[in-house]
Amino acid sequence: MYRLIVSLIASLICVVCFSQVNDSIKLGQAISLHDKAIKMHESGKSSDALVVLQDALALLDSLHMKKTSTYAVYRHDIGMLFLLGNKDIVSFERNMQEAIQLKQMCSDESDCNYSKMCYADGLNYYASSQPFPKNLQYYEKAILIYESIPYYESLERYHLSLNDLSVLYKDVNISKSIDLSHKLLKAQKSVSFSSIDSLKVNSNISAFYLENGDYEEALYYNNIVLNARESQIPPDYDKIRISNSRAASIYCRLNNYEKAIYHSEKSRELALKLYGKESVEYARSLQNTSVYYLDKGDVVQALEYTKKAYNNSFGDKYDLAHNLATIYSKLNHLDSCYFYAKEAWEMSKDLYLKNLQQLSLENRFHYVCSNRVSFGLTLPTDLLLSHENSEELCRLAYDRILFGKNLIMDCMLGDEAISKLKSINWNSIQSYLNKGEVAIEFWSDKSENLNIGVLIALVLRKEWSSPHVVKISKDKIYRTLNNIEQATESYLPLYENIWKDIIEVAQLQKGEKVYISLDDILAQIPIESICGYDYNYVGDKYDIVRVTSTRNIPIVREQKTPYEAILYGGLKYDTSPVDIQKESSIHYSSNRSIQENLFELMTDSIVSDLRSTNKYLPWTKEEVDSIYTILSNSKTIKNIRLYEEEKGVEESFKIISGNSPSIIHIATHGVSIHPIELNDMNWVDYYSYCMEHSGLLFSGALNTNVINTDGLKVEDGILRSNEICLLDLSKTDLVVLSACKTGTGGVTPFGLAGLQWAFKAAGVKTLILSLSDVDDAATHMMMVSFYHNLMQGYSKREAFKKAQKALRDSEEFKSFNYWANFVMLD
């Protein structure tokens, strides 16, 4: 028995010893693999190194070492390899976070802080490879991780991150740039040395405040920089030049032109001393000084400096030509004014088109928005309105309107639309006109206060040598509209403010055709249906044709026979999640090639706004059923798709992109939410807001959020304007939006941001829209009458006018408000 016990103990000791030896071997293998992986990474084989290091980690797992500092180190290194080898940010973050947690558990503070630094550095590295603004979130996260390290303010990397992020934010959130720069200044005070010059930080802060319109703060920080640089030994004269130039810019905005000129002259003298007369720096300083003299009202001095800058081979020829045109206008030298205005226009247009054609479709929008002013795409109303009898300036103004109006829309339509812009001019429009026809382009200067400013109408007849200009007071129109709930036929001030002078200047005769391309508030008023002094509607006396641009006149004359239609109505907005998923999957699975970016998850903040109108619309079912019957009896319509109840999901509409039918009819809730004022938004943000906050409701709009929270991929049931403009509906001749306020939108320099702009950008030829809330029964009668007329062989416009007249002639719907707010847009 004793011998047996001794034998068992000996065997157990052997097993334990063997196990320990085996564990030691495994640990040695893991360490060896780790070392091998590091060497492979250093030789540029990061992906292979990752596989080896994962094998090493598996060995540690088998040794039950998951809660050790060694395991944490391996996790750290695997995370770094995921990033450096595969650019796999998700796996990188997961491994780094686990490594940090393990090191905290092991009370290894110094190594934990090291991992945090590497984690933050990795996020910065990844962010540098990502497009703007996606990269912002990673830079932000890196800063938060740095700030979790006790001594973060002394970290050079933290300083660099703050500086880089402040510069990135300047185009999207200038207040954020200011906050980050102040945080950097504070951090710099805690260390004896920083690779980022504190004067550079102060200079950035000054620039950010200047951009933000806080001129006193901009001046304060610029003075800190300027005084410090002037006292440095040896002085850095180029930086002193730059600080003086900024001081001049700030003083100009503070209306202190004497000091602006003083600092601009100092900057100019330094530019001459450092770079000579034939330099970009000297040319710019001359140009800046000329602008300050012009703002001061010293036109003679402004002309002298502008000429010098213009003759410098490095001068910005476009800006200088534009400034010379302005100066000669003030001096009433019309020949010189027109010469330089035309030169500025031709240079800017050629450069603009060249740059635009080199950009991808998605980048064109940002380019158009950011370069709208610098390339002169807004009409110089100061020149035209000061010399409205100048035929040369009227011609140039018409050309600029043709190019500038709806430019973003043309960009969305592609290269062919852009190339046509190069040769189009007022002569082209005149050649489109027949005898007895008139073209009118309306244009508004867009100030930050949307309700004030000037509207102009440029009127063109076939026989004229140039367009004629008519001034319209925008604020008078707004005041008139504020005094009534909506335009009515008896409200004569609207006729007086809009039509009276135009009719006189255009010498309009009864029955003449008038093509009108509207802008600003006029695009949202049924100006065709306003009564004159004789109580006859303008649209009855003249054949008014509403167009997106007078460039579209040839398209208006084209008559296409419809062959296919798609109808939406009687939609069930509270369709059950099960039915939504069923209907959505039918359309999504039938065309897997549809662009992925057209499908969205319901994660944004506008849900409650767009879903606030959700009542079922029984009249819309009757409407589309009646239209279906009319089209079914037509000899030309070969295919009709009818979507009602739960069938009309958003996917069913998006799937037609690239192969859209001749006619699209949508009877549903329309939503258009746009701020009356810009507030803190710039024009680009305002435009984007309006495009995102306007749309049409489809089946299931009330319940798609339930599905999305379960992780299933369906559309949200709200077809927004910013989605529509991404679709290809170029095969569609007519879209009828039988819903409330589908013709309204936000007034921007880029057009009326909303549904009408979106469908036009998608390539639709003709739209029928509403400018106000619509009555269900009146709309039903209007639409049924329209399609009946259309199938009888009338043109779209004839069918539309006859349908409007049918409402006017009826006892129930003869009131202006029932029929006038429907408009047709070509």
Over which residues does each language-model region extend?
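Helix N-cap/loop-to-helix boundary motif
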Residues: 26-27, 64-72, 89, 107-116, ...
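Conserved alpha-helical positions within TPR/SEL1-like repeat arrays
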Residues: 31-42, 70-84, 116-128, 156-170, ...
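TPR-repeat structural position
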Residues: 46, 88-89, 132, 174, ...
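Alpha-helical solenoid repeat scaffolds used for protein-protein interaction
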Residues: 227, 235, 244, 258, ...
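Catalytic cores of enzymes
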Residues: 418-826
